[in-house]
């Protein structure tokens, strides 16, 4: 039998054909860590006893979870990264003011490219599969070993093939697509499998694809990956500073399952507490009052997400009972939002606008929920206590639904505030 897209990339790195279930050790093209995971990896790296990293251009250290530092402990975490970057001359250390949320920043900087094998000490590293590369999250010890050796080990995954048909309706985005899929297959529906997206992918922008690949892990997947097409090429061409290789799936590749997704059938989705699989169409939500809305994150903090929020919020006001927090995913996106007048409209509407940070998403800072509070967020997880108090609630939705709901004071379709 032929190979899936993921298996093709892993086979190329292994120098031979690999099979699902096989354990392999291969070279990596990028190793990533953030201000939570990298300090642990650095501590383990120092125990190995090597005097240099495998390649100072293939390591990315991105402080993003608690930046700007919220307290002494978080400041010390970033300082560990800073000192390590100086000691080993790490080229891709992104200091505060030049940083962004890691999974938006690395593609923007051209650091992850088609055909790459990318590991990151963060579960949403799977985001980069939007660019037709194999990207997956690992633990800090694996990150440490990879910084020393340039290698990582994997079990080759089986794959589920998602064949997309039709087109997105008005106010429907990649966030709605992935919530719809997770609602169908469940949070363990792709456990340790590759979610491979093909068919009418041209109906999805590159930002839609980043969002979908980002949340592959929420279905338990090892990785998410899209076919390479002209949309991928247009994005990569502007950013790539090195050569890359495009891989294609074999026509006779074997999949554990083939699932057809008709995009025409998808309405805006909302995931209810406390799992991303608890999805409902916006038409089935009912009147759910909210206290806070968060628009941003590695899932939905890109320029197109900011544009959607701007279109809905322009000339309107955030409901007096709602706090709206907006954080563009990178400094580059933030600056472009300033140039386009988005930030001005957000502030006029009554939103708080933040520099790039993961803070609210993990209940870290800049938007922590109190007991009994309810948030609607464009983030990727709504587990118990994810954004604050264990008796708070988090609902997940797209930027369009989030912006509209901030105006209404309860969860609504964007059509209701147009």
UniProtKB/Swiss-Prot annotation:
Keyword annotations: 4Fe-4S, Amino-acid biosynthesis, Branched-chain amino acid biosynthesis, Iron, Iron-sulfur, Leucine biosynthesis, Lyase, Metal-binding
Provide the protein name. Answer: 3-isopropylmalate dehydratase large subunit
So where does [4Fe-4S] cluster get bound?
Answer: 298, 358, 361
What the record says about family reads: Belongs to the aconitase/IPM isomerase family. LeuC type 2 subfamily.
The record's annotation in SUPFAM superfamilies points to:
Aconitase iron-sulfur domain
HAMAP family found in the cross-reference section: LeuC_type2
Against InterPro entries, the record matches this protein to: Acnase/IPM_dHydase_lsu_aba_1/3, Acoase/IPM_deHydtase_lsu_aba, Aconitase_4Fe-4S_BS, Aconitase_4Fe-4S_dom, HAcnase/IPMdehydase_lsu_prok, Homoacnase/IPMdehydase_lsu, IPM_dehydratase_rel_enz, IPMI_cat
Catalysis: reaction(s) = (2R,3S)-3-isopropylmalate = (2S)-2-isopropylmalate
Assigned EC number: 4.2.1.33
| Membrane as UniProt keyword | no
Please indicate which superkingdom the organism of origin belongs to. Answer: Bacteria
Q: What's the subunit arrangement here?
A: Heterodimer of LeuC and LeuD.
Which Gene Ontology BP terms does the record give? L-leucine biosynthetic process
Functionally, this protein is described as follows: Catalyzes the isomerization between 2-isopropylmalate and 3-isopropylmalate, via the formation of 2-isopropylmaleate.
Enumerate the PANTHER family for this protein. Answer: 3-ISOPROPYLMALATE DEHYDRATASE LARGE SUBUNIT 2, HOMOACONITASE, MITOCHONDRIAL-RELATED
**Gene that this sequence comes from:** leuC
The record lists the organism as Caldanaerobacter subterraneus subsp. tengcongensis (strain DSM 15242 / JCM 11007 / NBRC 100824 / MB4) (Thermoanaerobacter tengcongensis)
């Amino acid at each position: 039998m032929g190979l899936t897209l993921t298996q093709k990339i892993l086979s190329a790195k292994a120098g031979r054909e690999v099979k699902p279930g096989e354990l392999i050790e291969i070279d990596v093209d990028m190793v990533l860590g953030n201000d939570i995971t990298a300090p642990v990896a650095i501590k383990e790296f120092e125990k190995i006893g090597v005097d240099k990293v495998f390649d100072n251009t293939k390591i990315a250290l991105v402080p993003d979870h608690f930046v700007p530092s919220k307290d002494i402990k978080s400041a010390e975490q970033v300082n560990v990264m800073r000192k390590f970057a100086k000691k080993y001359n790490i080229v891709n250390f992104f200091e505060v003011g030049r940083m962004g949320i890691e999974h938006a920043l690395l593609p923007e900087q051209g650091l992850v490219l088609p055909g790459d094998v990318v590991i990151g000490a963060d579960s949403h590293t799977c985001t980069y599969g939007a660019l037709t590369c194999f990207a997956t999250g690992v633990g800090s010890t694996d990150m440490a070993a990879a910084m020393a050796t340039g290698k990582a080990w994997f079990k080759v995954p089986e794959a589920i093939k998602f064949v997309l048909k039709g087109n997105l309706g008005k106010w429907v985005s990649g966030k709605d697509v992935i919530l719809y899929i997770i609602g169908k297959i469940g949070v363990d529906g792709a456990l340790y499998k590759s979610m491979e997206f093909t068919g009418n992918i041209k109906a999805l922008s590159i930002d839609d694809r980043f969002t979908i690949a980002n949340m592959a892990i929420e279905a338990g997947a090892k990785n998410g990956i899209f076919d390479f097409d002209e949309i991928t090429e247009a994005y990569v061409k502007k950013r790539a500073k090195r050569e890359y290789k495009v891989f294609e799936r074999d026509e006779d590749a074997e999949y554990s399952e083939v699932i057809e997704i008709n995009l025409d059938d998808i309405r805006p989705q909302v995931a209810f507490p406390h799992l991303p699989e608890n999805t409902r169409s916006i038409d089935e939500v009912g009147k759910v009052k909210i206290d806070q809305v968060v628009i941003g994150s590695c899932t939905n903090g890109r320029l197109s997400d900011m544009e959607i929020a701007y279109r809905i919020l322009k000339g309107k006001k955030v409901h007096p009972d709602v706090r709206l927090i907006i954080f563009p995913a990178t400094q580059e996106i933030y600056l472009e939002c300033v140039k386009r007048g988005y930030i001005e409209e957000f502030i006029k509407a009554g939103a708080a606008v933040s520099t790039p940070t993961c803070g609210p998403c993990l209940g870290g800072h800049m938007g922590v929920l109190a007991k009994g509070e309810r948030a609607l967020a464009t983030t990727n997880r709504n587990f118990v206590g994810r954004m604050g108090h264990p008796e708070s609630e988090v609902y997940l939705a797209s930027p369009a639904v989030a912006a509209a709901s901030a105006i209404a004071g309860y969860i609504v379709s964007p059509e209701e505030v147009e």
